[in-house]
Amino acid sequence: MQTYPEILDFFMTLFGSILTDIREKTPLVHHMTNYVTVNDCANITLCIGASPVMAHAEEEVGEMVALAGALVLNIGTLDTLQIDRMFIAAKAAEKYGIPIILDPVGAGATSLRTKTAQRMIQELSISVLKGNAGEIGTLAGKQAQVRGVDSGGVNGDPTEITCGLAERLSCTVVMSGPIDIISDGSRTLLCENGHPYMGRISGTGCMAASVIGSCAAVTQDYLSASATGVSAFGIAGERAAVDAAGPGSFKCRLFDSMASVRSDDVDRYGRIRSV
């Protein structure tokens, strides 16, 4: 692992063991996600070694969550019925001690998305909050630019904003970007793995949340789970881009590359540093 200063020793041990545990335990990861990228999220979850399920019916979401190792909530194609179902699922996750990963897609773009995401972080025990700079900045109360589901940036220091929000919410926060920022309020990591093609296809942010959810299903150290997921997904992106002719072939190769990432690859190829 390349570190710029030295990363803490326990991270180096956990990263590899998390990927190994996913392949050995194949945890169920329950998604309540958007209909644009739902198939991509299911496939990337399978590729890392976990098992996806996408149950949305009010009558079964609580039961399904009880069987899962993690719950991923994604507000990319939001409506009022889905909001109610997400809260039912989240309350079940809290009851059974199951980690909740929230991807507040488009928070800051419309009042529905912003208010829903704000309500979720206020009323639910979120384990990992993952979003782009605009989304995280909005939820941190900063001036941010969000166009649709794309980030236009945030005013202020991104690392300080991420760390401050994590401390306030008592959860792990991931701000995605060219350099991903991962913080639980007291420990902060920067990850530089990835490739520009990842920003040229739809769904990579959603897929990253699925990978993080898969990692969070096998450890209670959600900072390590997030860093492992972000780095492993970024490494897969780097490998997929090597022979890709463009974004289309890159997307196909991304799934193959994710399936081939091994437990020691994050240690060998992860570009992670602590701050």
UniProtKB/Swiss-Prot annotation:
Question: Which molecular function GO terms apply here?
Answer: ATP binding; hydroxyethylthiazole kinase activity; magnesium ion binding
Annotated Gene3D superfamilies: 3.40.1190.20
Q: What class of enzyme is it?
A: transferase
Q: Name one GO biological process term.
A: thiamine diphosphate biosynthetic process
Q: Name one Pfam family in it.
A: HK
Record: residues binding substrate: 54, 203
Question: Part of which pathway?
Answer: Cofactor biosynthesis; thiamine diphosphate biosynthesis; 4-methyl-5-(2-phosphoethyl)-thiazole from 5-(2-hydroxyethyl)-4-methylthiazole: step 1/1
For the keyword Acetylation, the answer is no
Instruction: Give the protein family.
Output: Belongs to the Thz kinase family.
State the function annotated in the UniProt record.
Catalyzes the phosphorylation of the hydroxyl group of 4-methyl-5-beta-hydroxyethylthiazole (THZ).
Report the protein name in the record.
Hydroxyethylthiazole kinase
The coding gene here is thiM
